From Swiss-Prot:
Signal peptide: none annotated. PANTHER family: LYSINE--TRNA LIGASE, CHLOROPLASTIC_MITOCHONDRIAL, LYSYL-TRNA SYNTHETASE. It is an enzyme of class 6 (ligase). GO terms for cellular component: cytosol. The gene is lysS. It comes from Azobacteroides pseudotrichonymphae genomovar. CFP2. This is Lysine--tRNA ligase. GO terms for molecular function: ATP binding; lysine-tRNA ligase activity; magnesium ion binding; tRNA binding. InterPro entries: Aa-tRNA-synt_II, aa-tRNA-synth_II, aa-tRNA-synth_II/BPL/LPL, Lys-tRNA-ligase_II, Lys-tRNA-ligase_II_N, Lys-tRNA-synth_II_C, NA-bd_OB-fold, NA-bd_OB_tRNA. Homodimer. Belongs to the class-II aminoacyl-tRNA synthetase family.
Length: 500
């Protein structure tokens, strides 16, 4: 325990001995907030009495007068604390003992007073009542600013992710990211609602993981004595709802994949998936363009976004290029019609690692990921994927070896994925059986056979298009972050060893 922590615990005991509860249970009525006060104050207006609560972020004690910077949920404001105003009677202990000696930076206080403007022109609150609301036992890192420069900033990445609560306190920009994240989610939700689509909830705990090629997290249901899996995707449940008669459904889905962590992957992540009857992937491309253009204008006020040296333009239309053509464009190799052995030769020629468990689809995916994907900065639809890469997708109407699928690539990574959904139950069963063969071959991302989903398709599913957008990645783009961990409040990390 540090010297500061020991000192604060002694202050805690002293407060208790004086009959002051350092963690009172009573409601504290807050009537005003810092930004409202700064925006609404006029010197010629009647005296404005306010009640504010927040955390003490700095303090300057100058004898009988002190200045405090108070941080509430929306910003900061200066408090002017004068001994005689705070303690109008003979007993001055609240100022000289409690405020000056027993309170610390980081403590939560509630204050009442009136708003005024100092001689230096800073809107402040003249305090005449002060209540301790919560005693802080650990000192905050001190971030100093001068002439637009920040010093001693709390910028250790691992520390910021592990102690996000401290990061939110001392780094204003961090909180701004997550406020914008909420606005982005609300914008997507309102866009779907305006189209008349229904928001639904589907199971997170599943007996069969489906809807994506990914390794699931495995758990066990004790009461039923069966293995269960955390959801890797919600696709198959949303399609069941289309079978059941919903024409348009969507869900913000928390998904879990037992895979690696990097700048665009976290084991736990959020996507939004939408399924609309009587549509195809061409319609969905137009819909996706409209949605992203709308969101950018609503959140940013523009369809243009500057990230590093690039200006990304979300104004429709976006470029469309087939998977076969995009690989040829970047490698000079035309993979059309190649079998698995030929694709392995291409991988070796391009110095891409491959192993015997990889199917043709996986090999093509590796070529695209290693040699192509990262080069596409402007929004680009990669369309018409080989059949083996897309076991839930309808065959292309002009080429049975391809599927009606697209991925939207922006800033070098996948943002969205969509299909003309496969609704032929016989073809779907065969695709699942092909996946089972890949699983036996050693592909740990191959899909399970979901018999209930096949039964649902046998009742009939109308022509449907579905699309999923990685919400964390969308937030990354619109907040100009280079790592997915920056847009997750609590990104997954190796457990920390704590000693007490």
């Amino acid at each position: 325990m540090s010297e500061q922590e020991i000192f604060r615990r002694k202050s805690l005991e002293e407060l208790k001995s004086r009959g002051i509860d350092p963690y009172p249970a009573d409601e504290y009525i807050v009537t005003d907030y810092s930004t409202e006060i700064k925006r609404g104050f006029r010197e010629d207006s009647p005296r404005w009495e306010v009640s504010v609560a927040g955390r003490m972020m700095s303090r300057r004690i100058m004898g009988k007068v002190s200045f405090v910077e108070l941080q509430d949920s929306v910003g900061r404001i200066q408090l002017y604390i004068k001994c005689d105003s705070l303690c109008p009677n003979e007993n001055k202990d609240l100022y000289y003992i409690v405020f000056k000696k027993l309170l610390d930076i980081g403590d939560f206080i509630g204050i009442k007073g009136y708003v005024f403007c100092t001689q230096t022109g800073e809107i402040s609150i003249h305090v005449n009542s002060l209540t301790l609301l919560s005693k802080s036992l650990r000192p905050l890192p001190i971030v100093k600013s001068k002439d637009g420069m920040t010093y001693d900033s709390y910028n250790d990445v691992e520390l910021r992710y592990r102690q996000r609560y401290v990061d939110l306190i001392v780094n204003e920009g961090t909180k701004d990211i997550f406020l914008k994240r909420t606005k982005i989610f609300n914008s997507v939700r309102s866009f779907f609602n305006e189209k008349g689509y229904i928001e639904v909830d589907t199971p997170v705990l599943q007996s069969i993981p489906g809807g994506a090629a990914a390794r699931p997290f495995v758990t066990h249901h004790n009461a039923l004595d069966i293995p269960c899996y955390l959801r890797i995707a919600n696709e198959l449940y949303l399609k069941r709802l289309i079978v059941g008669g919903f024409e348009g459904v969507y869900e913000f889905s928390r998904n879990f994949r037992n895979e690696g962590i990097d700048k665009v992957h976290n084991p736990e992540f959020t996507v939004v998936e939408v399924y609309v009857s009587y549509k195809d992937y061409k319609w969905m491309m137009n819909f996706t363009e409209q949605m992203l253009e709308h969101i950018c204008i609503e959140i940013l006020g523009s369809t243009e976004l500057k990230i590093g040296e690039y200006i990304i333009n979300f104004k429709a239309p976006y470029r469309r290029i087939t998977m076969i053509d995009v690989i040829e464009e970047n490698t000079g190799v035309n993979i059309a019609g190649m079998n698995e052995n030929q694709l392995r030769e291409v991988c070796r020629f391009l110095h891409i690692e491959e192993d015997k468990t990889m199917s043709s689809g996986k090999l093509i995916d590796e070529i695209f990921g290693k040699k192509c994907e990262w080069k596409y900065i402007q929004p680009t639809f990669i369309i018409d994927y080989p059949k083996e890469m897309s076991p839930l997708c309808k065959c292309h109407r002009q080429n049975a070896e391809l599927t009606e699928r697209f991925e939207l690539i922006v800033n070098g990574f996948e943002l969205a994925n969509a299909y003309s959904e496969l609704n032929d139950p016989i073809d779907q069963r065969k695709r699942f059986e092909d996946q089972l063969k890949l699983s036996k071959k050693g592909d740990n991302e191959a899909m399970f056979i979901d018999q209930d989903f096949l039964r649902a398709l046998e009742y009939g599913m109308p022509p449907t298009s579905g699309m999923g957008i990685g919400m964390d990645r969308l937030v990354m783009l619109l907040t100009k972050q280079t790592s997915i961990q920056e847009v997750l409040l609590f990104p997954h990390m190796r457990p920390e060893k704590l000693d007490y």
